[in-house]
């Protein structure tokens, strides 16, 4: 089996999908997992990007379906800006589309600043912009888990196949969650689900950005990765791509394996 086929299998990618069926299956997964755990609902940070918009709407549909069946469940959408967010209008548009049961805002800027100031005071070193960006991602997850713990909710993650294959997420930041309803989807497949759900085009056609760097605000994922999502999706869906794309993706996949595993122990062999 080729590495490409192995990656497709490992990440549960289908070359083609039925958007309606995928929506139904993923909503059912959220419902079943929630019932199994006995939690009271879900919480997710909403950025205004494609992934959190899709995961948020699926979570809301799951909560509503559980209530229609006589159960109790709620979805809390959380805005987690670092000060003023340049694309705040998109975040508000996403919330309007998702229609969450509750919407809260938790500005992480003061918490991040307190940490970076203390880091410099105690180490004598200024935290790099890259590592500060990871602190932002982890602070957002701290906030979501605090809300989840306080309210009895499960934290939803937005990782999907195009992020998983590149390792393009912060370990124990946006990579930390209780359940992942977008697993196996390529970026373009996620767009198809949002289109099926009736989301505004602006939310799934905008260029994806993690927006974690102060020095490069709104830098796109594709700029940071050096690979387009079209190429990533083509690879994951088993289509022909250039040798340069194959080499770049497979190199990233192998080098970021630690992000897709639980912490290594002497009894594991995936890292050897």
Curated annotation (Swiss-Prot):
One of its GO terms (cellular component) is cytoplasm. Pathway: Cofactor biosynthesis; NAD(+) biosynthesis; NAD(+) from deamido-NAD(+) (ammonia route): step 1/1. Keywords: ATP-binding, Ligase, Magnesium, Metal-binding, NAD, Nucleotide-binding. It is an enzyme of class 6 (ligase). One of its GO terms (biological process) is NAD biosynthetic process. The keyword NAD applies. Deamido-NAD(+) binds at residues 138, 171, 178, 258-259. SUPFAM superfamilies: Adenine nucleotide alpha hydrolases-like (SSF52402). It catalyses: deamido-NAD(+) + NH4(+) + ATP = AMP + diphosphate + NAD(+) + H(+). One of its GO terms (molecular function) is ATP binding. Mg(2+) binds at residues 51, 163. The keyword Transport does not apply. Its EC number is 6.3.1.5. It comes from the Bacteria. Gene3D superfamilies: HUPs. ATP binds at residues 45-52, 158, 187, 209. Homodimer. Catalyzes the ATP-dependent amidation of deamido-NAD to form NAD. Uses ammonia as a nitrogen source. Belongs to the NAD synthetase family. This is NH(3)-dependent NAD(+) synthetase.
């Amino acid at each position: 089996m080729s590495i490409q086929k192995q990656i497709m299998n490992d990440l549960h990618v289908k070359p083609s999908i039925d958007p309606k069926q995928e929506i139904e299956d993923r909503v059912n997964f959220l419902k079943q997992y929630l019932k199994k755990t006995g939690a009271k609902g879900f919480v997710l940070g909403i950025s205004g990007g494609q992934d959190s918009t899709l995961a948020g709407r699926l979570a809301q549909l799951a909560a509503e379906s559980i209530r229609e069946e006589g159960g109790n469940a709620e979805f809390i959408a959380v805005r987690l800006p670092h000060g003023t967010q340049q694309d705040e209008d998109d975040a508000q548009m996403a919330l309007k589309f998702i229609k969450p049961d509750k919407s809260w805002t938790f500005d992480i800027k003061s918490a991040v600043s307190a940490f970076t100031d203390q880091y410099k005071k105690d180490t004598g070193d200024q935290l790099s912009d890259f590592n500060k960006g990871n602190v932002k991602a982890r602070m957002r997850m701290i906030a979501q888990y605090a809300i989840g713990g306080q309210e009895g909710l499960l934290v939803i993650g937005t990782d999907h196949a195009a992020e998983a294959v590149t390792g393009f997420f912060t370990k124990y930041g946006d990579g930390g969650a209780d359940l992942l309803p977008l697993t196996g989807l390529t970026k373009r497949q996620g767009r198809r689900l949002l289109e099926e759900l009736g989301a505004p085009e602006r939310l799934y056609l905008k260029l994806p950005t993690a927006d974690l760097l102060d020095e490069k605000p709104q830098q796109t994922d594709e700029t940071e990765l050096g690979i387009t999502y079209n190429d990533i999706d083509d690879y994951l869906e088993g289509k022909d791509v250039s040798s340069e794309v194959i080499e770049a993706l497979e190199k990233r996949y192998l080098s970021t394996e630690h992000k897709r595993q639980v912490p290594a122990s002497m009894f594991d062999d995936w890292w050897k």
